Each structure stands twice: as structure tokens, then as C-alpha cells.
Amino acid sequence: MRMNKILLVFVFLSIATVINSGTTSNFVRTAQPSTEMSLETFPSPAGHNAPEQVHIVQGDYNGRGIIISWVTPLNLAGSNVVTYWKAVDGDVKPKKKRGHASTSSYRFYDYTSGFLHHATIKGLEYDTKYIYEVGTDGSVRQFSFTSPPKVGPDVPYTFGIIGDLGQTLASNETLYHYMSNPKGQAVLFPGDLSYADDHPNHDQRKWDSWGRFVEPCAAYQTFIYAAGNHEIDFVPNIGEPHAFKPYIHRYHNAYKASKSISPLWYSIRRASAHIIVLSSYSAYGKYTPQYVWLEQELKKVNREETPWLIVMVHSPWYNSNNYHYMEGESMRAMFESWFVNSKVDLVLSGHVHSYERSERVSNIKYNITNGLSYPVKDPSAPIYITIGDGGNIEGIANSFTDPQPSYSAYREASFGHAVLEIYNRTHAYYTWHRNQDNEPVAADSIMLHNRYFFPVEELESGNTRA
């Protein structure tokens, strides 16, 4: 009898390691793909050779530079010039400066792009609003941005987080829900932008329409991009053997500032965050360029200056959805111990078209003899966020594994976006907002504790609207 009781306790404990107290939301959204917006939904702006698809990214390592990008139909004199100045009050005459962009175009199958202009502006003042203009004669268009505050450990800053956006009616809802939040200052975007490759011959016009679609946000706020599988555009059967060609031509970044040799992996420092961007679809095995770069970059992180260490990589390492299940496993096995040793705070991914937040877990103790092959709680591990739920044409990934595994804290098969409000070196507030009834409902939230300065276990503070 005593032996039976012992066996019963053992079985119960074994089950407890697999079945989680996490939440699988019962909110139901149709699995049908959202309607894609047509090419005509976002027409080119009026005016001769008017600039379009305007967007900005950080142009250096620490936030005193910006890359302003735009597209024009023709490469006319002056079309590569950007004029910019500090916003001033009253009758003060602004001191205007000019920058000159590099200009290129590309061909893809039967498509020829417009002229792609990328102007790098350096020496900006921190935490300052700038006005900028692109275009010539009667086609000048004006925008603005605010440079980030100077890097420091207690600098508050708010990031939006959007992934796998595409250009459907649901995508539009996601983007404008984020834009309605006055706190958002920059966007972390872990891949899959236009979904042009879901159309015949990777219809490059969808890259143009996507650029026009996101311009109302991307021309005013810095986007930090990771490349996803829908950016690969590798189609040798139609004469396109060069991976990432449209993405690299259209979306420049300051990768050289972080000593990277590729725009597909790089890092920046912004306010109190050190952000590392990795490429799921570039070689990352031992001694490859990405491996060597990441090893060196993690050594450079100074948590006394940038306490919040955030990584973006498109394919998730912890995912309990049957869609793309364990696709990120080889990269996890390669780098997870580095992330734990470096006390990474957050890892942001897309790829899976639903939402999930993990517990702080790791699976780094496994070897072929000890059988420790399941993730366990680890206070030094990051929280993994899967946010491939922007609204793209492929629809919702609504097939979660059952039972919910112990590493999964909250999961929901619906569209939305997230917001990360960094308060200081110890605390940041994270919320995920589902698209529901035309409102960005806050469905999941948690107060994050910094792994370097305050490595205390977080208490669940959300999941009240499941």
C-alpha cells in the first residue's frame, strides 16, 4: 500500500511538470484569413515625382543618427535631398540643414522598382523633435520625428511590438490600434513585412503598397526590423537567386555601426535598452559570421548603461502552437546558453500567427546521458514572446498543443500588438492588446523585473480578459 502511494505521488509530480497553470485564452476569432487590401487602397501621393513610402530607422549605435528613406518614380535633380531642422516655437526662424541620400533601384522578374533613396543624418541632439522634408517643387512632403533620449540606465522609453503585419483589413486594425497609443515612441518589428511573396512571382508591387500603408507610422517613428521568411524572396526558377534582395534594397539599417558584416544581424542601443537583431534564415552555426558577431556583441553589452537586453529573431524558440512547432530548435540549441549567461530580458519573435508569452525557462542542461530534455524554470532566462499576430493574409494559427506545456504562460489565437513601457533599470510594464470589437483590448500583461538589476520572479498581473 505504501509503495502504491509513493507511485501515485511520483505520477502526480510527473504530470505537474508537463501540465501548466498557464492560460489558453478562450477568446474565439475566425481562422479565416483577413481580406487583403488592394493595390489601389493606398495610391501614390499626388504631385510630379512625389516621394512615397517614407520611413525612418536608427542610423547609428547610440541614437544620434537616423536613416530617412523614401521612393520616387524618377531620379530627378533634388529628388535625393532631405531638408531637416529642429522644431522651434513661435517666430524663431529654424536653422535648416540638408542631407543627400544614396540612390538605387532594383529589378525583380518583370518588375523595376522606383528610385530608392536612403539618407543618413548624424549628429542629432538627443530627445529633440525634428521636422524633415523630401521632394521637390510642388511635391514636397513634410514629416517629423523625435530623437531618442541619451542612453542611460533609468531612461524611460516605450516600444510598440508588431510582427507579421502584412496588408489586410486586420493589419490595418493592428497598426492603427498601436498608433492610437500616445505613449509609443518606436516599434520593434520581428519580421514578415509585406507578404509580397504570397502573390504570383512575388509581386513586388505589394512591397510598394505596404510601404504606403505603414508610412503614417513609419515616417514618424523609428522601426527596428528583423528579417523574416517572407523577406527571403529566393526564387531561382524565375531568375531571382539572391535572397533578401527587395528587403535589403528597401530597408537599410546601420549594421556597420555594431561591427556586423550583414544588415540581417545587427544591434543598437536606444534609451535604456540594448537591442540585438538576429537572422533565423542566415547561417548561425559555430564560427559562421553571425555566430562570431553575436559572441562579441554579447560581451559588449554594458548593463550599467543599458540594463534592458532585448533580442529579436523571427522564428520562435519556445512555441506551443502546432504551426512551425520547433522550427527554431537548432538556433535555440546553439545560443540559448549564451542568452541565459547574459541574462537576456526578452526575446521577441514572429512567424507563428498567434500570440504567446512564455515563463522564464531554459533547456540548457541536457546531454545525451542525463535525460534532462524538458525546459525548467530559470530566473536567468528571458521571457519569450511570439507575436506573429499582426494580421497578415495567411490567417490565424489556431492549433495549440494540448495540454498547454509548462513553459507557456499565456497564449491566444487572435490578432494584435504589444507595448513595452520601460520605467527604469528595474521595472518595465508589458501589455498585449488583441484586436477585438474595434478596440485594442489589453488581454495579457505583466510587470517585468530586470534580470541584471532586479532578478526577482515576476507575478502574473494580466490574463484577466481571457
Curated annotation (Swiss-Prot):
Cofactor or coenzyme needed: Fe cation; Zn(2+)
Tissue localization of expression: Specifically expressed in flowers.
Known catalytic reactions: a phosphate monoester + H2O = an alcohol + phosphate
E.C. number: 3.1.3.2
Subcellular location as annotated: Secreted
GO biological process entries: phosphate-containing compound metabolic process
Glycosylation sites: N172, N367, N424
Entry keyword Ligase: no
Annotated binding of Zn(2+), by residue: D192, N229, H314, H351
Domain of life: Eukaryota
Protein's UniProt name: Purple acid phosphatase 25
Gene that this sequence comes from: PAP25
